[in-house]
């Protein structure tokens, strides 16, 4: 998930449960992600390989666990496609309001833009436009830079006593509001984890270096630490800008674009509109990335389960799994229409619901990986003569504890709202379904595991940075400049473009 996208909408989801303490939930989420990152860093450095969550889980504790992790990731990607598409709709509608097309956003507009986002993602996933991901990367960088400028202005004006609403400097956002239990923070932390989704993809940029055992941990920890600091500082500035009192928290929760609103209030309408537009474009890019990731993972799962039948059509020109892509994007569009017609008129509801479901199943994958990391580092590696470090015995267990308690707190006590219960049921059914398949069809499970392991590149996330770097590689090769490609080799039977696959390993 792009940083500008996450910082502009995920905090509202946490704010609905923890009020002013949103930055505190991101502190906890950052700690949790760093604990998980430790396992990734240690395993990848031992194996000198930047594998996916499901690939490394399969290596450390067995192919069955790897299949569960792969299935969980597919559920997360499908959910996040809904999340990011709806986010594009919400920010796109807010941008049009800023242009003066209407004073109050018509309820249908975000849904229409979300469907357009799915359509654009479908077209680009099937027939990628050269340089499109590099362009999206630059939009993300520029939007993040504008957000940083707004943050500085907000802090200066609040500290100087010149805030537009009389807001004063305070650190109340790092204290749990009266009447709210500390354990409630673990309800809001879900949106913190959502902001980090896919952080382990940074390892793909370290794998091709001359010293991967050093580069991979730096890449993983660097992304997790930078992301954590960005989100903690960003949400703190947001609370300062809106105010940590009841009125400020209410305005915070109702804002369609957090830094867009702050830019408009503290600097000018044009600045706010730029942030909102940039975030909408970032959301569309993330929708494309999740569509690419989900379709390739579905392709690999389907090939293993049905022995080459089903979603197997691949473009001879681009190597894109066309049938899987059309199914994933068509399913996303159908769900958006169904939810709008039969469930809710509020666009933010689908954003929050899909984000929660996706994060819960993603935590299952991260939890399985953390179990595998502890087992590999503390049991298997010592048997092979590799002594475990003292932290190896502790950090993965802490990661398991944080993930486990987060999931427990989202279930117990049982939610009062129908949507809260539905989120848990959907996530549970998704995970239980693959467990049933594993128990009932062990031969199918083995085929799926083999398909996933042979196609890690095909079942990976299309991260902005990895794909953008690959495009730079291709440009250099066209001009006969020697370069070491950061791209993932194409899986057997798939076509390559410019000598390299379009997927970046997660």
Name each model-derived stretch.
Residues 22-23, 99-109, 138-276:
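Helix-loop-helix junctions that connect adjacent transmembrane segments
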Residues 49, 72-90, 196, 200-209, ...:
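Membrane-helix boundary/coupling elements in multi-pass transport proteins
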Residues 110-164, 220-225, 361-368, 380, ...:
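Membrane-interface loop-to-helix entry segments
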Residues 370-395, 414-506:
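Terminal cytosolic tails of multi-pass membrane transporters
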